[in-house]
Amino acid sequence: MPDQTTSTHLFAHILARVHAVCAALTDEGALPTGTDLSRIVVEPPKDASHGDMATNAAMVLAKDAKAKPRDLAEKIAEKLRAEDQIDTVSIAGPGFINLTLKPAVWAEALRAVLDAGAGYGRSRVGGAEKVNIEYVSANPTGPMHVGHCRGAVFGDALANLLETAGYDVTREYYINDAGAQVDVLARSAFLRYREALGEDIGAIPEGLYPGDYLVPVGTALVAEHGAALKELPEPQWLPMVRAKSIAMMMEMIKADLAALAITHEVFFSERSLIEGERNRVADTIDFLRAKGDVYQGRLPPPKGAPVEDYEDREQTLFRATAYGDDVDRPLLKSDGTYTYFASDIAYHKVKFDAGFGNMVDVWGADHGGYIKRMQAAITAVTSGKGALDVKIVQLVRLLRNGEPVKMSKRSGDFVTLREVVDEVGSDAVRFMMLFRKNDAVLDFDLAKVIEQSKDNPVFYVQYGHARGHSIFRNAKELFPDLPDATEARIAFLKDANAERLTDPSELDLLRRLALFPRTVEAAALAHEPHRVAFYLYDLASEFHALWTRGRDLPHLRFIINNDAEITKARLAMVQGVVSVLASGLAILGVTAPDEMR
């Protein structure tokens, strides 16, 4: 739940009034001095018919007051009824307090949207805290596939969201360039190198990467080395081919990400942990050993299903069980090289030492079992001062009209991210990847996401923004001086008499606009950008519904030619909708078109 004390939006204002009421009750002796008010929240009620806002104040403070929740609720409600902005107060169930605000509050809320302009929804809740978000981090062994796409979009949108909420965000990509898979990449590229020299390589052997995307690597190796590599033994050519292959794969990956407008500030090489000026992995193991968290020991045989990294031998172990894990974890393999886990601990220590006490990792669904050990390691290596939130991104099922999509010839065994973006566009990909919670499997239908219908959420939301601009264009007849530029148009509409907006559907739309800053804060604190996508769809739905009502009921049309005052008020409301849709879409990394083409 957001720390609403750092917020300036309407919900935070009402929370402040609830706090003031509790302070008054403390003065009267109904609450003890020093009562913790941080547990109080003000939020939309689950049932909109109960009012505009609800608070749990009586429920969480009743024990302190040594009173029944409902009795305390009566005392709080009595004082809240005296507040200028509150119309009615009711008590539900055991002691929940429901509030209905006066209509004038919603007119004022619209003015707040216009006054803030593009800044509406921005927050200081993050307090400029440094946050490192590591996402994508696909192995540098080929082009991005559609599965990578979801994690890429999620991580980028989360970074945008946290920046909007006032965090200092660094976007990072961890290059897995030290494992066996990059040696396989090098051998696969060397085969393409021989092919580029004119050799018939036949079928790609089992265990190597078969995709055509390595053909340009072979060509580049010939341009750089001629036939010289062919005469060298593998231990000599492999490091050179590996480095070239990784570099070209990363350029391909960066180009794929650019198609979705995704960039990273930091690309961190796993290999640099070991081959840099210092061996960071060895340093980290020594650091943990000095704390008593690394020891030489033999793990007991696993119970039930086999553990993938179990070996019946004495080995170097991290005392993960001391930090909540189920079993202690090996740091060295039988051949003396580091486990991936050891490198991962060192990598996160590097981030923590750089000032990132708040770290977010975006992982694929197949890494879910890795979370507990990694969080144990973070607690140990940061002495409890660092926090790691792992967001699991579930699988994407790619469909066309409900049928699974066939694999790509270019990649050999998967559909590439670029193929999907080229077919349906970046906006459709980004919005739909965020229109479901990250830990739920997503069906992505290539045919559905380009439909121009309510059933296509990205179209429906973007159309809301375009429809608003269409209304502005049509209003020129009544208001010839209505500016086209956003800031000038907002300035023109600021003196609109928003109190004329009295229809229940208009007030519902204003309530929805007032909810946006709180939605942003709650989504940021929960690391859940899908909440913004859901909000935008609901806002667009209410806006479209109001437009449709105006078609059937002339007095509700946005433009009333013989009533300039109500028209200007409704244009101000439309501007509020357009501004919030644009701000929300920007968080998701989706464009807000003025016209749909």
Curated annotation (Swiss-Prot):
**Gene3D superfamilies from the entry?**
Arginyl tRNA synthetase N-terminal domain (3.30.1360.70), HUPs (3.40.50.620), Isoleucyl-tRNA Synthetase, Domain 1 (1.10.730.10)
The record's listing under SMART domains reads: Arg_tRNA_synt_N, DALR_1
InterPro entries given for it?
aa-tRNA-synth_I_CS, Arg-tRNA-ligase, Arg-tRNA-synth_N, Arg-tRNA-synth_N_sf, ArgRS_core, DALR_anticod-bd, Rossmann-like_a/b/a_fold, tRNAsynth_Ia_anticodon-bd
In short, the EC number is 6.1.1.19
Entry-linked Pfam families: Arg_tRNA_synt_N, DALR_1, tRNA-synt_1d
Indicate whether tRNA-binding appears among the record's keywords: no
Compartments reported by the entry: Cytoplasm
Q: According to its UniProt record, which reaction does this protein catalyse?
A: tRNA(Arg) + L-arginine + ATP = L-arginyl-tRNA(Arg) + AMP + diphosphate
Q: Give the residue range of the signal peptide.
A: none
What GO cellular component term, any one, is given? Answer: cytoplasm
Q: Which HAMAP family match?
A: Arg_tRNA_synth
UniProt-recorded name of the protein: Arginine--tRNA ligase
